[in-house]
């Protein structure tokens, strides 16, 4: 027999909460917008959330550091169904967002597996510890059973600056398919939920050729001397 005689946090409603908590319905949002990852969804609806997709930046190409209120990625606590989610094993050592910190990999959780996301946009270090200085993100997973949810997303960038064709065209093609299904376990409300997601993201190139000479017949000293004479 286990008797609970105390708790660090008392139960309260949204009205009793002294700090703002954003509740994001991922199922409804996914049906309205093109956001396909947790970072993109939170960037779209949470004003204090920041996540930037990195390029040519070691492991942060796949693990996008996320932050709240402009603080470090290691100061954001991520919970899964109210339980603490572990940090990733990647240390940001390049000149990217959150250099020197260790963030939580939100991309490891498919958006199709999430029912809603709760974002506490204030410090909660007194309750959760120093890794909640910036705020807390609680991800609530789906609990549905005997129901198949299938989602397909596709898109691309259409621009005259695309170098795929001489006159412009499309690049950055993106395709994602995800599925979620749950099964009942036993007769006491148990269940198991499966989610799979596959994404293919193409490259985007906005570079152009340089149409002017890099080196000229005049060296730096001659050019500076000419300016000195002109303004003398």
Regions found by a protein language model. Give the residues of each.
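Extracytoplasmic beta-strand/coil segments of soluble accessory domains associated
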Residues: 39-89
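Transmembrane beta-barrel wall of Gram-negative outer-membrane proteins
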Residues: 146-149, 163-232
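N-terminal periplasmic accessory domains that precede
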Residues: 38-41, 45, 66, 79, ...
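Short, polar/charged loop or turn motifs at beta-strand boundaries
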Residues: 17-36, 40-43, 65-71, 98-107, ...
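Non-catalytic regulatory/gating segments with a bias toward low-complexity or hydrophobic composition
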Residues: 21, 29, 42, 117-118, ...
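N-terminal periplasmic "start-of-domain" segments of outer-membrane beta-barrel proteins
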Residues: 2-35, 39, 60, 89-99, ...
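Outer-membrane beta-barrel pore domains and translocons
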Residues: 7, 122, 153-157, 197-199
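Short acidic/polar hinge/loop motifs at secondary-structure boundaries
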Residues: 83-121
């Amino acid at each position: 027999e286990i008797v609970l005689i105390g708790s660090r946090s008392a139960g309260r409603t949204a009205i009793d909460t002294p700090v703002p908590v954003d509740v994001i319905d991922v199922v409804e949002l996914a049906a309205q917008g093109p956001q396909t990852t947790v970072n993109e969804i939170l960037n779209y609806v949470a004003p204090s959330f920041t996540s930037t997709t990195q390029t040519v930046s070691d492991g942060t190409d796949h693990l996008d550091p996320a932050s709240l209120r402009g603080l470090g990625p290691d100061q954001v606590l991520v919970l899964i169904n109210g339980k603490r989610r572990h940090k990733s094993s990647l240390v940001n050592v390049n000149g990217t967002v959150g250099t020197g910190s260790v963030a939580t990999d939100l991309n490891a959780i498919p958006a199709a597996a999430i029912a809603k996301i709760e974002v506490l946009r204030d410090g909660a270090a007194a309750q959760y510890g120093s890794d909640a200085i910036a705020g807390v993100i609680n991800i609530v997973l789906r609990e549905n059973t005997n129901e198949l949810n299938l989602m397909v997303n596709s898109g691309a960038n259409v621009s005259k600056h695309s170098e795929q064709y001489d006159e412009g065209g499309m690049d950055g093609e993106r395709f994602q398919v995800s599925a979620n299904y749950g099964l009942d376990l036993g007769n006491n409300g148990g269940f198991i939920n499966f989610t799979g997601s596959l994404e293919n993201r193409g490259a985007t190139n906005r570079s152009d050729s340089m149409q002017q000479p890099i080196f000229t017949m005049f060296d730096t000293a001659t050019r500076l001397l000419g300016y000195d004479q002109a303004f003398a």
